[in-house]
């Protein structure tokens, strides 16, 4: 009885055992080895492309904000009782609202920026972390209506400073790369969240 049972078991499992001695078995093994590398490659490609796209959208938002600010009058900058809490000039609030609207049109969470008040000191800085901000981070918008940068003019004894509007934007980005790199490098540690920053400067027209 025992011998008969062994033969029956061998008959059942022999086809499966043969699989592991064929070329198909080698391919399965190669796939198992390559799978973690493939996962890291796919997630890494997705992560970096998403970060690049976000950077481009932030660039555009900052550029639009600076261009808009440069065309606004500066006679209200000493009047910080117009909007927000703490209050800030109406022209600065207008820049905040434009940047917030641009982010939302680009399908980026504005973290509640449109309802935030600016810092009490210049340059005016808005910090927003509500509305389900990614990774529990913070969006930071800084509006400087009196930013001056040196411009070289031929024949001048020194640089001339051009009064401009500068908009700086910082946004949290959550990486997923660190979740899969563990397959290749156990114990490897990468930042889960980083701030992507950008700025734009446009000379004031006023």
Label every model-predicted segment.
Residues 23-26, 39, 93, 194:
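Alpha-helical membrane and juxtamembrane elements of multi-pass inner-membrane transport
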Residues 27-73:
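Aliphatic-rich helix starts adjacent to a transmembrane/signal segment
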Residues 2-9, 60-206:
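Short, conserved structural patches
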